Every structure is written in C-alpha cells, then in structure tokens.
C-alpha cells in the first residue's frame, strides 16, 4: 500500500468553493506528424482542507481516492504565492 502516487504541478484558477479549488495542469506533447511541441491543459478539482489557496498560486497536487464526484486530487504544498 506504499505505492508512489502521481504528483503534478499547476496553478489555481478558481477558489470560490469551500475546501476546493480548480487547478490547470499544463503539459507538452510532440505532434506525431509535424514533430512540433503542443501545449495541452487539463482542469482538475482539488481538495484544499484549510482554504489556503489563492488564484494564481503555483501548487503541487497528489492523486488520492475519490473525495466527491469530481475531486480525486489533494493539495500537497504551495510552491509560489501569487502577488494579488
């Protein structure tokens, strides 16, 4: 039961929900024909137990068991606070 869970970095785009936030995770993939790198984005709902995230923060998130219908990621730490 001590397997390594997925860790991702992203930035907060919404924190209007109680104990929740929305994170955008960007990744680069290489196009199979044109060999050009393309940015892909994924929106993930995360669990923020202490409501410490603000919009623009760069965070690390970890995969966990499903907490609700859309939340299956939790906040690990905040890498950089936003200047708002």
Swiss-Prot record:
Secretion signal, residue range per the UniProt entry: none
Molecular function, one GO term: rRNA binding
Gene3D superfamilies in the cross-refs: Nucleic acid-binding proteins (2.40.50.140)
Any single Gene Ontology cellular-component annotation: cytosolic small ribosomal subunit
GO terms for biological process, alphabetical: translation
InterPro entries: NA-bd_OB-fold, Ribosomal_uS17, Ribosomal_uS17_bact/chlr, Ribosomal_uS17_CS
Sorted UniProt keywords: Ribonucleoprotein, Ribosomal protein, RNA-binding, rRNA-binding
NCBIfam families, A to Z: PRK05610.1 (NF004123), uS17_bact (TIGR03635)
Role: One of the primary rRNA binding proteins, it binds specifically to the 5'-end of 16S ribosomal RNA.
Family indicated by similarity: Belongs to the universal ribosomal protein uS17 family.
HAMAP family found in the cross-reference section: Ribosomal_uS17_B
Protein name per its UniProtKB record: Small ribosomal subunit protein uS17
Organism: Buchnera aphidicola subsp. Cinara cedri (strain Cc)
